[in-house]
């Protein structure tokens, strides 16, 4: 699994973080980014989802980080909806999402 927490702004000079990036730089862009997954039953050469032509927004099959985590659990044979208990003995699901079944062979 290889992902970052942000993409890059689709246009130079757009400041989204307030860090004062220069007019020829790109800033963080949390609305659309890429990831790579391999092994553990993932389809070889498969591309899932699509962004618009500028890479600023997903337009087909977006995957939320929760769904990615559920897919990782699934690949290990762990049900993402497994109930675990925290330090206060409160029940919690590992993740409230379903695995992205299209990723798997």
Question: Each PLM stretch: what is its role?
Answer:
Residues 1-105:
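Ligand-binding pockets and gating/stacking loops
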């Amino acid at each position: 699994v290889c992902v970052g927490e942000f993409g890059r702004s689709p246009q130079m000079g757009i400041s989204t973080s307030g860090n004062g990036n220069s007019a020829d730089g790109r800033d963080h862009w949390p609305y659309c980014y890429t990831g790579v997954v391999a092994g553990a039953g993932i389809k070889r050469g498969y591309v899932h989802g699509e962004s618009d032509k500028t890479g600023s927004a997903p337009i087909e099959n977006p995957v939320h980080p929760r769904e990615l985590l559920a897919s990782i659990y699934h690949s290990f044979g762990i049900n993402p909806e497994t109930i675990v208990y925290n330090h206060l003995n409160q029940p919690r699901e590992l993740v409230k999402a379903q695995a992205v079944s299209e990723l798997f062979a």
